[in-house]
Amino acid sequence: MAAGKEIRGKIKSVENTKKITKAMEMVSVSKMRKAQERMRAARPYSEKIRNIAANLGKANPEYTHAFMKKNDAKALGFIIVTSDKGLCGGLNTNLLRAVTAKLREAQAAGVAIESVAIGSKGLGFLNRIGARVVAHVTHLGDTPHLDKLIGPVKTLLDAYAEGKLSAVYLSYTKFINTIKQEPLVEQLLPLAEDSLKVEEGQHSWDYIYEPDAQSVIDELLVRYVESLVYQAVAENMASEHSARMVAMKAATDNAGNVISELKLVYNKTRQAGITKELSEIVSGAAAAAGV
């Protein structure tokens, strides 16, 4: 029964793996819910800033912030948001494939690239392809804080404000639902004019500025862009935990199927052994009776 013992060992090994993947699935479910709550909580903040900035811009049409101006520089900035950990299906692979296509397009046009990596997977990818990484932040944990993001992101924002970059792109995985996540490479700067338009029917407020309207608009637009990056990180984190939950569930289900198949093989092997032993006993008894 050496074969049977070997199969029992395989069954035990797969059962242990199944316990691990099931535990990881349950942990991902809990983290996914919390990440979704943070993602939804961040949306009203950026929307409120956008509304105020839109009203201020409408009241001061003569002033154009640097983030609204188009630059002629032959360089692009990329903020790439990925996860720190793996085991989340094709989440990072799909995003980095979209980023690669955009980078190749820029390189073919002879445009220089400056990158900021948020997440270990994106940083590793940029290092492998030899991209210029001007700043990075990793290991944000399950509760990302804006103050950890501001420093690296500010590197590209300042470069754009100084006219050194013609555009800044933000790449992340947008959370659609638990099953579906969408990799995106969106233009962050210059800000689209439509993004700061006052919506029809929306009440316009009169503000008292301290110290002046220009200073307030400058500060608000910086905060608005930072909030967009934070929102992208929150969306990516919700997508990560959702993708990991689905991947671990699939792994658990596959482990269950493998266990069922191994048990079937084990039972057949055991049955064959028993049949062989019975045949030998019957043959021996028949031989003894004939003597």
Swiss-Prot record:
Pfam families: ATP-synt. It is found in: Cell inner membrane. Disulfide bonds: none annotated. Keywords: ATP synthesis, Cell inner membrane, Cell membrane, CF(1), Hydrogen ion transport, Ion transport, Membrane, Transport. GO terms for cellular component: plasma membrane; proton-transporting ATP synthase complex. The keyword Hydrolase does not apply. GO terms for molecular function: ATP binding; proton-transporting ATP synthase activity, rotational mechanism. It is a peripheral membrane protein. It comes from the Bacteria. Its main location: membrane. The keyword Transport applies. One of its GO terms (biological process) is proton motive force-driven plasma membrane ATP synthesis. Belongs to the ATPase gamma chain family. F-type ATPases have 2 components, CF(1) - the catalytic core - and CF(0) - the membrane proton channel. CF(1) has five subunits: alpha(3), beta(3), gamma(1), delta(1), epsilon(1). CF(0) has three main subunits: a, b and c. Produces ATP from ADP in the presence of a proton gradient across the membrane. The gamma chain is believed to be important in regulating ATPase activity and the flow of protons through the CF(0) complex. This is ATP synthase gamma chain.
